[in-house]
Amino acid sequence: MKRFLLFISILMMIGTIVVGKEGYAMDHEGCKFSCFIRPSGFCDGYCKTHLKASSGYCAWPACYCYGVPSNIKVWDYATNKCGK
């Protein structure tokens, strides 16, 4: 039973590492990258191109990205510097 739990724990860790993190794309000022007036599919392309993410979508009004590499910064409420 202990080995089974260890195995499951390792699989969960691998999934977290391989999938990457997720979050809102940021602009050069540290604000969420707006998709308010962008065409459909814009955020998916932006996330893949600029953040090297696996996918993205417009979580109105900002681009939200999935599978972002750990070395790429995404918007975070705790470290928000937008407009400051």
Curated annotation (Swiss-Prot):
Has the structural arrangement of an alpha-helix connected to antiparallel beta-sheets by disulfide bonds (CS-alpha/beta). Beta toxins bind voltage-independently at site-4 of sodium channels (Nav) and shift the voltage of activation toward more negative potentials thereby affecting sodium channel activation and promoting spontaneous and repetitive firing. This toxin is active against hNav1.3/SCN3A. It is found in: Secreted. The keyword Secreted applies. Belongs to the long (4 C-C) scorpion toxin superfamily. Sodium channel inhibitor family. Beta subfamily. The modification Cysteine amide is found at C82. This is Toxin Tf2. One of its GO terms (molecular function) is sodium channel inhibitor activity. It comes from the Eukaryota. Residues 21-83 form the LCN-type CS-alpha/beta domain. One of its GO terms (cellular component) is extracellular region. Contains 4 disulfide bonds. Expressed by the venom gland. Gene3D superfamilies: Knottin, scorpion toxin-like. Keywords: Amidation, Disulfide bond, Ion channel impairing toxin, Neurotoxin, Secreted, Signal, Toxin, Voltage-gated sodium channel impairing toxin. Negative results: does not affect mammalian sodium channels Nav1.1/SCN1A, Nav1.2/SCN2A, Nav1.4/SCN4A, Nav1.5/SCN5A, Nav1.6/SCN8A, Nav1.7/SCN9A and Nav1.8/SCN10A. Disulfide bonds join C31-C82, C35-C58, C43-C63, C47-C65. Residues 1-20 form the signal peptide. One of its GO terms (biological process) is envenomation resulting in negative regulation of voltage-gated sodium channel activity in another organism. Its main location: secreted.
